[in-house]
Structures are given as C-alpha cells and as structure tokens.
C-alpha cells in the first residue's frame, strides 16, 4: 500500500516501475540488440501488423503462448519502456535542469530513476510538466525519441527479422469494402484465434482542428479500429500498434511515423489481458461525444489515431481493472483552439491513478449503465445530472413531452441523451414555435444549473446549437428562428456575465459560419442577431470585446472573402444605426476597420468608403464636443468679453494645430464661429469682438502649419458660418465687419479678405439679404483698397523712389560744381604764367560743370519717368502676383519634364533650395504645387490599379526574331511593350520627402527677415 492508503501499483507503471537486477541485465542486453538490427522499410498501403517490405505500418501485433503464472512483462513491453519512455524521461530531465535548477535533487538521475518518477507522478508538478511539453525544442526531442524508438522496436521484434511470433503483416481474410471496412483474424503462433480486427474508414468534411499556432487543419479522412477489450478465445499475448494517419487519411513517411499501441499480456487464466496503452502526446479528441476521434499534433502536423473517445475510455478502464497502467505521456489542454466542432477536452494525466477510485467508478458505471464521472472522463463529461429542474408550469406552457422534460430536469443521462430526446421530439413536431419553445426550455435548464461552472454551460449550449444545425427535421429558415430563440435566451439570462456571454456568442458565430446546412442568407440573419445582442451589452469594454471576438471569428471562418466582405459591411451599417453615443460607435468601428485593414478582408474601394464613413462619424462627434466647449466658455458668468475672446482664440489655435485634414479644421472653426454668432448668451457687440479675435488667430497662425491656401479655405468657412447663421441681418453685418477688421489689424493677406467677399456673394441666403449685405461688402472693399494703397507705397519705397533723396542728389551735384568753380578761379588767379587769361579759362570750366549738372538732373528725371510709365519696372500688386504665378508654372513644368527620380531630386536642390535669386514665397508656392501634384498622381493610381502606362524596352540575345539589318545579322533585337503602374509608389515617396525637406529648409531661411517681409510685402502669403 502507498502512504496515502491507496494500493501501490508502481510495478505496473512503466514510468515508475522498479526493476530487479535480473530484469535490468536483460534490458541492457536487449538494448544492445536493438541497435544491431536493421530498420525495415515501410510499404504503401497504410495498414500492417508489423513493419516489413511487404506491408505498411498501421496495426501490428505480436502473439505467443507464455507459461501460465509468468507475470513478467514480455520483451515488447519492456522494449517500449526502455526505447521510448526512459529516453523521454531523460529529455524532460534535461529541460528541468536548464529551466528549474532548484529541482536538481528531485530529478537527479538514479539507477532506477525513483525520484524523477515520483516527481512526474505528483499532481502538484503538472503545471511544470505541461510547460515542458509546450517547449518547442523539448517537444521536438520527445517526438524524435518516440519515432526512433518505435522504429527500433518494430524492426527488432519482427518476424522478418527472425523473431518468433513477432510483428508481421496483416493477412486480410475478409474485405467487405476496400474503402469502408476491412477485417482480419489475429491468431497466436499455434494458429488459434485471439480476436477479429475491423477497420472502418470515415470520410468527412466537417472536422476542423487547430494546431498550437492557431492554424486550422481540415480532417478529410480517419479510421476506427475495434480494439478488443476482453479476449477469451485462446491463450497468449498480443500487441496492436496502429500508425497515426495524416489529416487526409494517408500514411506518413517512415521517419515521421508514430503509433497508438495496445499491449495485451497473458493473464492468470492464460488469456490476453489489456495491460497497457502507449500513445503519442498530447492526445486530443475532435469533439465531446464518445464518437469523437483522437488526434495529435506531431512535428507541426495533425495526425488521427484509430481510436474514439468512447473506445479510449473503455480501454483505460480495462487497463485499471487488470492492474495495468496507461503509459501515455499525454499532457492535455483545456480545449482545442477551434470552436468548429465544439470544445475538445483531453484527459488530464495522472500518470498514476489509484485503483480504489477506478474500481469505484467502474462499479458506478455498472449500476447506472451510463458513463460515470471518473478520473478518465471527468474533464470530458459535463455534469448534466446537476442541471436545475424545470418547474411544472413551465412544462405545461411549453407543451414539451415528459421524456424531454425528464431529460432536462433529472438528467441522470448524458448531454447526448438530452439531445437525442430533443431530436426525437423535433422529428414528431414540425411547428416552428414549438421547436423554438423546446430549445428555449433546454437552454434555460442548462444556464440555470447552479452547480455547473461556466465552461460546462458553454459546452452544453454549443452542443445544443450544433444539434440545431445538423438536425434535418428543422428546415433552413426555421433554423434561423430556433437559433435566434437560443440567442435571446442567452441574452436574457441574468446569471451569466456579459463578458462570458460574448464567449458563447463567439462560438455560435463559428458554428453558424462553418455550417454546410444553411445558406449565406441564413448565416447573415443569425449573425445580425448575434451582433445585435453584442451591441446591447451596456458596459463599453464588454461590448467592444464581444463585437471584436465576433468579427475575429468571421475572419477565421472558412467562408469566401467576398462573403466576409458582405458580412463586415452589414455589421458596419448595423453599428452605425445603433442607438448609442458617437464615442462608442467610434471605438467599435475603428476597431473593425483596423481588423479589415490588417487582414485585407475588404476591397480597397470598400475600405476607403468605410474610412470615410468613420471620418463623418468622428466629425459629428467632434462638432458636438466643440459646440459644448464653446457654450461653456460663453456661459461662464465671471468671464468678461476679453477673457472669453482669449479662450475662444486658444480653442481655435488648438484646432488649427491639430493633425486632422484641412476640411475637418474648416468645419470645426465654422462650428465655433456659428455657435458664437447664434449664441443668446452674448451681446452682438461682444460677438463681434470674439469673432474679430478668431479672424486674427487664423491670419497670424504659423505659415508652417497653416499655409495661405488653408487660411483662405478656413476663412471662407468662417464667413459662411456667420452669413448663414440665424442672426438678424444687422447683427451679421456687424460681425462680418468685425471679422474683416481683425484680418487687417493682423496685416492679413488680401486673398483672405477676398475669401470673405466671395463667400458673401455665393452664399445660400436669399437675394434681398445679399443686397442688404452689400454694406458689409463695401466695408470689405474699402479695406482692400486701403491695403492696396499701402502696398503701392511700400513698393515705391522698395524701388528707392524718394523725393528727399532725389533733391539731395541734385543739390549735392550743384555743390560739387560750385566747389569746382571756386578751385578753378583760385587756380587761374594764382597762375603767374600769363599765358591764358581768366576770361578764357573760367567760362569753359563753368560751362563744363553746368553741363554735368544738367546731364545728372536729366538722368534722374528720365529714370523717374521710366519707373512711372506703363513700360517701367514699377509694378502693381496684381502684376507682380501674375508674374510670380507664371514663374511658378514655368518651374513646375520644367520639373515635370525630368524623366528620372534622381533628376527630379537634383532639380529640387538646384532650383528651389540653392537658388536664392527666386523669392522665398515663389519657391514655397512651387513646392506646394508639386506636392499636390504628387499626391494627386498617387491617389489616382490607388483608385484605379488596373490603369497602366506602356513602356517600350529593348531586348537582345538568341531568339528566332529577324536581325535588325543584313549588315549586322548577329544582332537581334525586339521591342517589348511593358505595362507598368503610372506611379512608382516608392519613387513617389522619395520625391514627396525631398519636397517636404526643401520646404522646411526654405522656411528656415532668414526667419526674422521673413517675418518683417510678411508685415510689409503684399506678395501672396502662404
């Protein structure tokens, strides 16, 4: 007995069993023999009793007679223990040494490995062991040990290798159907029948499982073997080894083959007894029913085993009865990574299971005639028997027959029994309402089970949903109603948290979309109901989680991409029309659009359209938020007009600095202005001051973040907000005048003022109001005229036309003449030579100097006349503006003529960055035009991907083409027309980057000087 009072069965446990010295010596001898044998080839038919050149590995058996009473394990069992299990223990030991050095004493290598076997048997260590099996390197080494070990065992102990009674090919004695059923009789070495084996091949398209990395794999074919439980025909022992098949039903390569082996050893009466089961790890099942087939993930691939959940449980119980032990190293996970077949559970090991508990479970099974909840199937079988009973009045109202109610109330049977009873009722009753009532009652019973945890409820609800889809007695349209009833029951359940409901909704979507029993139309109807329930969740976080999980399931489903697109569009519209805040809609839609962009579920056109819709929603939300903020500022009783103006200006500046598009900025500033203009909280004169402040803020905002073009657009929107507001006409005139005053006080550009005039003329107000607003337009015109006069004056000063300077030049020249004349007279008077008289020399000098004065005066006058003439260099503001525009167009055209990206980059540097002869404003305008052109080309390419340009390339070389000329026959060339995208996106990005860098460089030139120019120059600002 063990210390805990349970029977010690370690001698039957291949991992923990202690061996005698004689057994150890025998094992060492066998191990030496293993590696001296050759490994046999594997044939192609996929089914064998032993590995040989004439048959394939699938089922292998060894049978021989052993003396009664010899309870020592036979060589096959011992070989598997040593070749596979001991080596796998060493691999696990190495993992723990590296990851958990504190376990060194517990896992130390010993002759009998007692400590480590005890460590593996301790349930407290299962979490650590599970991590080991999840480690990629460790898992790979465990798989390799299993593959190599089986090769050694199957080749060493084969009939072909001279081992008497060893593994050998199955000889088919009866083949009912080559594709469905095969059978053979297994005999011992004396020719006595031990059992009959049947193999059934199952074709399917409904089984989809997920690998550890989340990749989904469809199982198209698997097989089942009727492994015998009791053998009472002949004496001997037997080993059945079944190779795991690939997901398509074919056998794997011999270097990847693993096996499910049942070991039958001779019992006390000489008859074979099922003592051990060796299986790959981790073992999983596709579904929760007894007919669910086993599968494994090995080497990154999915393989099926020829055993079902029901058969596996039955065999494990027999092992326990015979004091044997499962040697599966299978570690289990809570559920499969797919919800297509429903949650898939696996048996949580223990490696050692106390016999007392096993025997108790078996007695219970015998008395109740239903599978009990034992350590083998506890995690597989929901506790249906504990579901809350329906009240009598519920039974009467639903019209559900007593057998079904008994199944849902007492539930002494399994979930499958409940489903069977439901199906029986559905077959007899085709009324949709009654079918829906039945499903509702069953769902309530499952959800109201207070002793069942959420996982069990979830599994049972999903089983119920799967049953609805697979039931042929419910027509397709009726399935929609029945499933929707089930969903409503889940929605109305008060005992389940919203976050948990979302898990059931997610599973329901997976089952719905992957069902082959309903059309896309019905799938969409059910999905709309699921989304509606998800959107009805009150908590924002839970709602987002629910909708996100639903859409993730849609993306992972096996429906076509065009169908996924239809579903996403429907869900988008559903969310958009739902009655909750724009903030909530924004979060949901933004999350969905990120998913569609990442997975490319939507076409580019549809993605763009949805993004625009989201932008509109965002705009509306921002507008409402902006109105609220403006009203809060205006409502503040302790703030005077100056403080309110300052606060509105700060708010305006924040909008202008925001990263949104210019269209959004215009709309928001218009909302601010219109809210101020229509506010009943502020007097008209105060509104005028506030709007005047808005105008100043726009005009003086940094040209870097807000170019002139953008200021013009925004000012037009501001004017529209005022002109089309609900104010009295006189108030609108006053506010418009204030806006214009603010622009001129801030020395705004004429283009900004013209934007206001244009908006007034083109507004949607009636003609009488337009005429009444002429006064405001006149004010604007006068302001513009004053501005033009100021600009002309600045231009004259810039051309050095200054009256005082001209006067000084003539006066100074005259003074020079007088001084020269004085010098001449003095010279003449001092001349003693007497050769020339004063009367002769003085007139000549005076005449010459006066002539110089006349020429100088005439030159100055002519220059002034030339400057003031129509052909002169003095130009008006509009003339200079036109000249600048022509220069901009000329250089833009020159840029477009550059054929390569490199030439265009050089053009940007030489003509825009380094060319200081061009004004700063002209260069910046050129860059703006080029940036817009590049963006337009890129947008057109994205919108019409099929549009191509033709490029002619020349190829040469050996070909059957004719030579170019008779003189050069060895040169062969051909023109090849190559279609290419109109815009190379990578080159487009390079050019736009170069333009942006150039703009930054130009804007940083003489920053202080540029500020002065903005105040004094009339050239169009940016």
UniProtKB/Swiss-Prot annotation:
Principal location listed in the UniProt entry: cytoplasm
Residue pairs linked by disulfide bridges in the UniProt entry: none
GO cellular component: cytoplasm
Keyword terms, alphabetized: Cytoplasm
Region (Disordered): 1-33
Composition-biased stretches (Basic and acidic residues): 14-24
Subcellular location: Cytoplasm
A GO biological process held by the record: symbiont-mediated perturbation of host cytoskeleton
NCBIfam families the record matches: Sca4_fam (NF038365)
The protein's name in its UniProt record: Antigenic heat-stable 120 kDa protein
Gene: sca4
């Amino acid at each position: 007995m063990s210390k805990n009072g349970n029977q010690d069965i370690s001698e039957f446990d291949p991992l923990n069993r202690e061996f005698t010295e004689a057994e150890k010596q025998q094992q060492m001898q066998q191990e030496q023999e293993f590696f001296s044998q050759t490994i046999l080839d594997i044939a192609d038919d996929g089914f064998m009793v032993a590995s040989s050149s004439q048959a394939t590995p699938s089922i292998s058996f060894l049978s021989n007679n052993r003396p009664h009473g010899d309870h020592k394990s036979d060589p096959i069992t011992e070989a598997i223990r040593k070749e596979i299990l001991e080596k796998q223990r060493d691999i696990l030991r190495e993992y723990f040494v590296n990851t958990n050095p504190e376990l060194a004493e517990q896992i130390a290598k010993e002759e009998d490995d007692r400590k480590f076997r005890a460590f593996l048997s301790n349930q407290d260590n299962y979490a650590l062991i599970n991590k080991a099996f999840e480690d990629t390197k460790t898992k790979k080494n465990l798989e390799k040990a299993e593959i190599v070990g089986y090769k050694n065992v199957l080749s060493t102990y084969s009939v072909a290798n001279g081992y008497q009674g060893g593994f050998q090919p199955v000889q088919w004695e009866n083949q009912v159907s080559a594709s469905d059923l095969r059978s053979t009789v297994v005999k011992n070495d004396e020719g006595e029948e031990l059992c009959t084996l049947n193999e059934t091949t199952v074709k399917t398209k409904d089984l989809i499982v997920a690998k550890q990395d989340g990749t989904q794999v469809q199982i198209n074919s698997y097989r089942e073997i009727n492994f015998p439980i009791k053998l009472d025909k002949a004496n001997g022992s037997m080993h059945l080894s079944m190779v795991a098949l690939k997901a398509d039903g074919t056998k794997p390569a011999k270097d990847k083959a693993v096996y499910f082996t049942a070991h039958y050893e001779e019992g006390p009466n000489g008859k074979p007894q099922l003592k051990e089961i060796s299986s790959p790890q981790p073992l999983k099942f596709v579904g929760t029913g007894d007919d669910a087939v086993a599968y494994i993930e090995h080497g990154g691939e999915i393989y099926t085993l020829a055993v079902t959940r029901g058969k596996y449980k039955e065999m494990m119980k027999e092992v326990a009865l015979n004091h044997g032990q499962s040697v599966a190293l299978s570690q289990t996970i809570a559920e499969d990574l797919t919800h297509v077949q429903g949650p898939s559970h696996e048996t949580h090991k223990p490696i050692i299971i106390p016999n007392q508990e096993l025997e108790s479970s078996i007695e219970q099974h015998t008395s109740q005639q239903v599978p009990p909840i034992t350590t083998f199937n506890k995690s597989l079988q929901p506790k249906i028997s504990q579901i809350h009973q329906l009240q009598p009045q519920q039974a009467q109202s639903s019209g559900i027959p007593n057998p079904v109610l008994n199944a849902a109330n007492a539930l002494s049977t399994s979930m499958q029994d409940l489903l069977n009873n439901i199906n029986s009722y559905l077959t007899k009753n085709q009324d949709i309402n009654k079918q829906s009532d039945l499903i509702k009652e069953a769902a309530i019973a499952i959800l109201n089970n207070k002793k069942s945890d959420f996982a069990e409820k979830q599994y049972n609800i999903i089983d119920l949903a799967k049953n609805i889809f697979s039931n042929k007695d419910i027509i397709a349209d009726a399935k929609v109603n029945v499933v929707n009833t089930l969903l409503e029951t889940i929605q109305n359940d008060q005992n389940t948290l919203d976050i948990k409901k979302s898990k059931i909704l997610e599973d329901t979507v997976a089952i719905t979309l992957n069902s082959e029993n309903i059309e896309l139309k019905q799938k969409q109807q059910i999905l709309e109901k699921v989304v509606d329930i998800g959107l009805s969740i009150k908590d924002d976080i839970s709602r987002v989680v629910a909708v996100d999980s639903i859409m993730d399931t849609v993306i992972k489903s096996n429906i076509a991409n065009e169908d996924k697109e239809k579903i996403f569009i429907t869900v988008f519209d559903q969310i958009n029309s739902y009655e909750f805040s724009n903030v909530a809609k924004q979060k949901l839609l933004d999350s969905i659009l990120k998913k569609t962009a990442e997975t490319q579920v939507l076409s580019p056109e549809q993605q763009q359209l949805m993004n625009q819709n989201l932008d509109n929603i965002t705009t509306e939300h921002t507008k409402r938020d902006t109105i609220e903020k403006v009203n809060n500022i205006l409502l503040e009783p302790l703030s005077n007009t100056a403080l309110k103006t300052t606060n509105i200006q700060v708010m305006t500046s924040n909008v202008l600095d925001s990263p949104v598009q210019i269209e959004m900025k215009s709309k928001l500033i218009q909302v601010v202005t219109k809210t101020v203009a229509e506010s009943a909280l502020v007097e008209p004169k105060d509104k005028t001051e506030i709007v005047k402040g808005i105008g100043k803020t726009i005009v003086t905002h940094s040209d870097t973040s807000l170019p002139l073009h953008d200021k013009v657009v925004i000012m037009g929107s501001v004017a529209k907000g005022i002109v089309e507001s609900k104010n009295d006409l006189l108030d609108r005139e006053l506010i418009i005048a204030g806006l214009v005053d603010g622009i001129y006080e801030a020395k705004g550009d004429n283009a900004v003022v013209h934007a206001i005039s244009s908006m007034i003329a083109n507004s949607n107000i009636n003609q009488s109001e337009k005429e009444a607003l002429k006064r405001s337009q006149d004010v604007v015109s006068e302001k513009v005229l004053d501005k033009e006069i100021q600009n002309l004056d600045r231009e004259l000063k810039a051309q050095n036309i200054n009256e005082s300077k001209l006067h000084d030049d003539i006066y100074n020249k005259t003074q020079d003449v007088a001084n020269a004349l004085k010098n001449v007279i003095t010279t003449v008077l001092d001349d003693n030579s007497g050769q020339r008289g004063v009367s002769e020399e003085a007139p000549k000098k005076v005449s010459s100097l006066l002539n110089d004065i006349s020429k100088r005066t005439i030159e100055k006058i002519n220059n002034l006349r030339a400057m003031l003439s129509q052909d002169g260099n003095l130009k008006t503001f509009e003339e200079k503006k036109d000249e600048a525009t022509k220069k901009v167009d000329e250089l833009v055209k020159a840029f477009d003529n550059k054929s390569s990206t490199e030439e265009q980059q050089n053009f940007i540097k030489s003509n825009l960055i380094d060319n200081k002869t061009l004004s700063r404003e002209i260069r910046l305008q050129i860059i703006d035009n080029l940036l817009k052109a590049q963006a337009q080309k890129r947008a057109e390419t994205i919108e019409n991907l099929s549009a191509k340009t033709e490029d002619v390339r020349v190829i040469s070389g050996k070909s059957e083409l004719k030579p170019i000329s008779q003189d050069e026959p060895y040169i062969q060339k051909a023109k090849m027309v190559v279609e290419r995208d109109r815009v190379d996106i990578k080159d487009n990005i390079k050019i736009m980057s170069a333009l942006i860098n150039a703009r930054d460089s130009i804007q940083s030139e003489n920053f202080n000087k540029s500020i002065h120019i903005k105040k004094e120059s009339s050239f169009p600002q940016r």
